[in-house]
Swiss-Prot record:
It comes from Staphylococcus epidermidis (strain ATCC 12228 / FDA PCI 1200). This is Uncharacterized lipoprotein SE_0186/SE_0187. It is a lipid-anchor. InterPro entries: Csa, Csa_sf. A lipid is attached at C23 (S-diacylglycerol cysteine). It is found in: Cell membrane. A lipid is attached at C23 (N-palmitoyl cysteine). Residues 1-22 form the signal peptide. Pfam families: DUF576.
Length: 261
């Protein structure tokens, strides 16, 4: 009986240890998820930005990469990527460079076709249409002959102008990934087609699938903030070897010289 009692005690201790360890692991996961949400909240809480030029008067995260007199540059990018089965990847998007020092904004609308040959070599063909932003309106630097393209650019809206993440903290049970060596991090949530952001995307784009997307918050650099790090919001509808349908958006604050324009 004494031996039996000792066995029961040992088993109980093992179960308790496993339970406590499991709770500790879950708490670490939950804490990291909360950190990732908080990191993205600083930017996503600005959505929707009805008037993009309001960003001239809004400062983002600053670190030692900034010169003292540099007010910084906002870089905004939204792009829809669609690759149907057996076809090339087509990407259509727009990027803005909003210089807070000069209060001038330049950018370009871009389309790219990405293909891969039998040897796995990737080829990319891209076209850019340059423009300026004045009074919250896009003004191409040169006349556009193609009326379809002209209207697409004229009516283009960045996701940051209509997206809404006021309930970001309510998203639960995300699939969290964190690599401190890079560092890189991500949090993934399954959305429904009834989600307001998904509805908005479907209104603006011809999305060739009825599948509901996953919301993926991913970034690199210091979680607390970094001007050389990157944060992206992705709504991924389909991602496999045969086809890819996903939307990507980012709003970043960088030193003014870190700029491709």
């Amino acid at each position: 009986m004494k031996y039996y009692g000792k066995c029961i005690s040992y088993i109980s201790i093992l179960i308790l240890t496993f339970f406590i360890g499991g709770c500790g692991f879950m708490n670490k996961e939950n804490n990291k998820e909360a950190e990732i949400k908080e990191s993205f909240h600083k930017t996503l809480s600005m959505y929707p930005i009805k008037n993009l030029e309001d960003l001239y008067d809004k400062e983002g995260y600053r670190d030692e990469e900034f010169e003292k007199r540099d007010k910084g540059t906002w870089i905004i990018n939204s792009v829809m990527n669609i690759q149907k089965k057996g076809q090339a990847m087509e990407s259509r998007g727009m990027v803005l460079y909003m210089n807070r020092n000069t209060r001038k904004t330049t950018g370009h609308f871009y389309t790219s076709i990405t293909t891969e040959d039998k040897k796995g070599r990737v080829y990319n063909k891209e076209k850019n249409t340059l423009f300026n932003l004045k009074n919250n309106k896009i003004e191409p630097t040169k006349p556009i002959v193609d009326e379809t393209l002209k209207n697409e650019i004229k009516n283009f809206q960045f996701f940051s102008q209509y997206g809404n993440f006021k309930n970001l903290k309510d998203y639960k049970n995300g699939n969290v990934s964190y690599n401190p060596n890079v560092p890189s991090y991500s949090a993934e949530y399954q959305l429904s087609n009834e989600d307001d952001n998904v509805k908005q995307l479907r209104k603006k784009y011809d999305i060739p699938t009825k599948k509901a997307p996953k919301l993926i918050l991913k970034g690199d650099g210091d979680l607390k903030g970094s001007s050389i790090g990157h944060k992206h919001v992705e709504l991924s509808f389909v991602r496999n070897k045969e086809e890819s349908i996903y939307f990507s958006d980012s709003v970043e604050f960088n030193p003014s010289e870190v700029n491709n324009e």
